[in-house]
A protein has these predicted regions:
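A short, hydrophobic C-terminal helix/tail in secreted or cell-surface proteins
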Residues: 138-155
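Mature extracellular "passenger" or substrate-interacting domains of secreted, surface-exposed proteins
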Residues: 1-135
């Protein structure tokens, strides 16, 4: 997870919750400001309890969290779900806690929880100031490099 400047790494042990409004309302999530991670565990219930023991050291701070209204959502009822991400290694800065919401879950891929697809990308992109992305190399480039090296080795052996 990166800080607000987009370059400073502020943690390596992130915990993320994909929550619908019937699990925990956005307003209730904001009410957890200043409370420990145990308060989130209690609010979410045993089904969403932490597995990382370091999470208990983290104090929730929502001062810099992305508010629903800044995402272009009219009010705290005009959304379907939201994503709660925070650092679990004991960092207590408010920049270690992020909240973002989405209006539409029509494209959510429920069969693969590792790839959450937001219904409207604009809601997530408006929180881009706090996130940083890293370009991943194309897998075929490595394969082509290996094939080229193998071909070169064969030519040398034949010569």
């Amino acid at each position: 997870m990166y800080g607000k400047d987009g370059t400073s790494l502020i943690g390596t042990g992130n915990v993320a919750y994909f929550l619908t409004t019937d699990m925990l309302s956005y307003s209730d999530a904001q009410a957890l400001k200043g409370k420990g991670a145990a308060a989130i565990t209690t609010a979410l219930g045993s089904a969403y309890s932490f597995t990382n023991t370091e999470a208990g050291k983290f104090t929730v701070a929502l001062a810099d969290a992305v508010d629903v209204k800044t995402l272009g959502i009219a009010d705290n009822t005009d959304y379907t779900a939201y994503l709660m991400v925070f650092d679990s290694t004991g960092i207590t800065e408010s920049s270690s806690f992020y909240l973002t919401a989405t209006k539409d879950l029509s494209t959510y891929d429920g069969t693969n929880s590792a790839q959450v697809k937001w219904g409207t990308q604009s809601t997530a992109s408006k929180a881009a100031g706090a996130w940083n992305s890293v370009a991943a190399p194309e897998p075929t480039s490595g394969l082509l490099l290996l094939l080229g090296m193998a071909g070169l080795a064969l030519r040398r052996r034949c010569a």
